[in-house]
Amino acid sequence: MKKVFGLSFALSFLITLSAFAQPPGVNKGAVEAFNKGVSEANKRNFKEAISFYSKAIELDPKHANALHNRGIIYYNMRSQPEAVADFTALIGINPKDHDAYNERGLAYADQKKFAEAIADYTKAIELNPSYTAAYNHRGNSAFAMKNYTDAIIDYTKAIELDPADANLFNNRAKTFKAMGKDKEAEDDLAKGKRLAK
């Protein structure tokens, strides 16, 4: 199943913190290291970016943006245990961060830890009931576990939230096909093709 990955390098780590006008108590060294990490990530120098984000985290262990950005890079470099560790630390800092649960779920799914992934997507949805990507990702993990009925429920909810996303129809079509529901699969594939034009 194709992933719709909110992390997938729309370079969602382009969060910059200005070194100017920082609130009192902010570690300026951590801010500088973070900004250098963003700069290196923008140049696609990911190993250097990780090094700077790691420095920012060393100087400020609760630097949520550095943890987030480093976790994204680890995910995209297929270093999933490290990505899971960063997203787990991020959840420890902000247990209401629905994106961190979704992102950790993706890292679990890439390791074929689908039960853990589903638990994280479920938490993300609990925190943000309109989180289309989390429904889609949970559907992908349910599909991987051959829980086709659950996958259909999640893809259908995702389609309700974003009826213009061809990928969602294609995912549901593959699931209908796996269930032997060829007519429903064909209908969804046709809708997906129309939307993809």
Where do the model's predicted regions map?
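Alpha-helical tetratricopeptide repeat
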Residues: 2-197
